Amino acid sequence: MGRSRSFIVLISLLLLTSGCLRQAYPTTAPVTSDVELQGATVVSPSEVLSKLSTAKSPRFLGIWDGVLFDYELFDEAVLARDLERIERFYHARGYYEAKVTAARVIRVDEHRVRVELRVVEGAPVITRGDIQRFGLESVSFDVGIAAYTAVTLRPGEPLDEDAYEASKQAMTSALADAGYAFAKVNGRVDVDIAKHEAKVAFFVQPGPLARYGKVDIVGLSEVPENKVRQALQITEGEAYSESNLQDARRALIALGVFNGVKITADRSDPESRQVPISVVVEEAPLRSLKLGGGVRLDAQQTSAHLVGAWEHKNFLGGLRHLSVEARPGVVLFPTRTNNIESPNRLLFEGQLRSQLKQPAFLEGRTTGSLATGLAVFPLLYSESTRDDPLIGFVRPDAKVGLERAFLDHHLYLTPSYNWQAYLPFDYDALSVGRSIDVERDSRLIDVIASFPDLSVRLDLRDNTVQPKDGALISVSWQLANALLSGTVNDMRVRPELRGFYEIAPGWVLAGRATVGFLFPSNYAESTESSNREQQLLDECQIETANPAADPDPALNACQRLAEDEQKLLVRGFFSGGPESNRGYPYRGVGPHRALSFLSRGNVDCTADQYRDSRACLRPIGGLTLWETSIELRFPTPVSESLRAAIFVDASDVTRGVVEFRSNALHLSTGFGVRYLTPIGPIRFDFGFRIPGSQAPGIDSGNSQADGDPPLLFGLIPATLNLALGEAY
């Protein structure tokens, strides 16, 4: 009843305030309330309407016009020109007989009109199959094939002016890539309206082979020119290539010190066979200080943090990029979306990170980097209770690596060496509020991961922040070893594929698939089989009841279990969360069991009656992972900056090496909204776990194998996610 009353009050307030904020209707002209195009079948009506000046007035929340947005005024002269634009739009796509047969202006009321348009598209003019190319005889076979196949105009399809112009440009670029900087491509189109067909021919003048002339760089002030030239890799006298110029521009942008880069080739003197190059840059501020903050509210924790960051992009000269960031925060424990209650403890956490990058390291296109960090954080779960003693970790880490771009900055190779340490401690020392001491368990160990990492990324997306088309393929390979005091030995491999396709203007279908494999050699004994795990658990229970029975730690079952659990916590795979399976909280998908190194207050999780209870079960991590997702992203009528999405996610994590289960999909579906900002979309997702499509243990009501995440607000099997950036 209280929630219903609150909802009614909210709607009433919106209705009242909308009247206060709504602009008065103009008296000079009627307002266009809607524009409708009928008869459009070969193209989307919205695509045609987006080209017109006559447009419907935007509506706040899709309901009220004149609230926060200006009205669109109706003008008969503008509408007349728009009718010509519609016919020209169709002509450019091969529909030469298209006509606007009706344009009705309907008076809605004394202030508003609705515009209804009707178009008859007619039959298209089809491109004949014999598209001719003349003039390629004078170039080499490989160059001729590249120019010949560059034509994007397709025989048997409607004659498209954009494809025709793009074909000429593509042929010119193919020749320019091979050194023919002065190449010219002309075309001729003979249209027979009666037969609805068109003959197309291209005429090529390759011109002489060219070389780069003098290379001038304009606009430098603080940025050292020698580093710019090393990244540019364009030298006077070398063979000309248009693709190399485009790659050079991307390399300069990747330096991160320019707001704009423009590279111009001077082709005004073909007889000289020299092409002077002008590089005009606009330097960005090289030093910056940033202050801010953020909040986190999900099924694992509620927290707030501050952010302070400083960077210098020419530290000590040579374009060295030094950045330092501090992020102190506080967790309101145990408040979270599945446990709405007042906190009884404040847990202080934080991290400090620094990174130094050196462009043109070893050679012009390679960047060297050195990063260090220190983090302090509690070990929290979506099942944690207000009476749980808590442990946390101090995590120092370091990384040294290289990054090199290939294939016009589409392929990135990143080898690095990494060192991470997880040092456990009693988190009562960093808590304010209720004091719950936990005696440090002798089973707690320091876990140190020392490993080389080879990451390869092939990025074919049209945009890295808001992709609409393309794909991203990546793979990471790690080999943990005993160097630098490492305590884990394993091999970890994780490939991933992401794809994007714009099915209609603004409507993007996105997909993601990944697998992960972990091959441990000095841990994970307890995950070999359920029988072996049960044997160790039983032995541990006996040892707990008779502490003097086995004084040798090497033979201690409890110690072996605890070491397995802590190493898997660092190196194992988990699934669930805003960038994973969104129907589950962080680490919500995968094997669960009572962790022998964690205390549960008054509950003895080693006892048979508690071992498989929700009070004791926690995610342990697994050796095999798979995740898939499909998502439809689309615009909303509220604002261009506000977009929406619907998605389906599935994933699983198993204990075994290369072990897959066909009956454990952990299927979730949901919806979300994204508010676009310059630094990426602010994303809110609601993920719902589909009953009967999870894992055998969950679906049957027995959660021993896979855990059973708490209900959202104690009501529904779902999770709320708030994050910055798309899920993928």
Describe the function of each predicted region.
Residues 120, 205, 280-282, 307-313, ...:
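Transmembrane beta-barrel domains of outer membrane proteins
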Residues 232, 265, 287-297, 306-308, ...:
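Transmembrane beta-strand segments that form the barrel wall of outer-membrane beta-barrel proteins
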Residues 2, 19-46, 51-297, 301-309, ...:
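Periplasmic polypeptide-binding modules associated with outer-membrane biogenesis and secretion
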Residues 342-444:
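Transmembrane beta-barrel wall of Gram-negative outer-membrane proteins
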Residues 8-18:
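Bacterial N-terminal signal peptides
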Residues 184, 260-262, 278, 288-292, ...:
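Residue-level detector of the transmembrane beta-barrel scaffold of outer-membrane proteins
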Residues 254, 288-301, 313, 420-641, ...:
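C-terminal outer-membrane beta-barrel translocator/porin domains of Gram-negative envelope proteins
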Residues 258, 284-286, 315-317, 349, ...:
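Outer-membrane beta-barrel channels and translocator barrels
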